[in-house]
């Protein structure tokens, strides 16, 4: 992500971090963390996700140490070396690095003003047998495109028909 250079923004970030640390259990922060997140982590995640996922429950939440670790785990579980994952034609560079390291092929779906092509995804499902669809639907990195609701629904319908898991990297969806 871009590094802030505005002194006022940096001061607010420093003050916020100091406020968090002032009330934190430092020993808990320095020890190994609970696998999948602490109950407090999961409660915070449920609070964050509930506006979009009203039935969200802490028992179905897995907290990870960052997107790279989570993507590496997901990609390694869904695809083996030489297998394929569909992505937007311009996709998150971190995913490219992970796929390269794991030997997974990324198949680029062409983009238009609404997002990745649904017809291209359907054709890929029929002919290439992808193991997953990775998408970054809100402020697609690096294009800043937001995928339309109708396109999201079309992609989801295709994924359901072909039993293709979707990895939705939607860090900005709540903004």
Predicted regions and their residues:
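Conserved core of the PLP fold type I
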Residues: 27-163, 167, 173-175
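N-terminal "arm"/small-domain region of PLP-dependent enzymes with the aminotransferase-like
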Residues: 1-36, 40
């Amino acid at each position: 992500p871009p590094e802030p250079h505005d002194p006022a923004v940096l001061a607010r970030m420093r003050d916020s971090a100091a406020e968090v640390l002032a009330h934190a259990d430092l020993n808990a922060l320095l020890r190994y963390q609970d696998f999948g997140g602490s109950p407090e982590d999961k409660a915070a995640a449920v609070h964050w996700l509930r506006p979009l996922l009203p039935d969200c429950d802490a028992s179905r939440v897995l907290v990870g140490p960052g997107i790279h670790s989570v993507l590496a785990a997901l990609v390694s579980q869904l695809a083996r070396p030489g297998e394929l994952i569909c992505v937007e034609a311009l996709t998150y560079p971190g995913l490219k690095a992970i796929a390269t390291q794991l030997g997974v092929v990324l198949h680029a779906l062409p983009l238009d003003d609404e997002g990745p092509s649904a017809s291209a995804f359907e054709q890929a499902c029929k002919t290439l047998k992808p193991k997953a669809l990775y998408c970054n639907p809100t402020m697609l990195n690096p294009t800043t495109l937001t995928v339309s609701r109708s396109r999201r629904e079309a992609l989801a319908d295709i994924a359901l028909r072909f039993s293709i898991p979707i990895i939705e990297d939607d860090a900005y969806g709540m903004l």
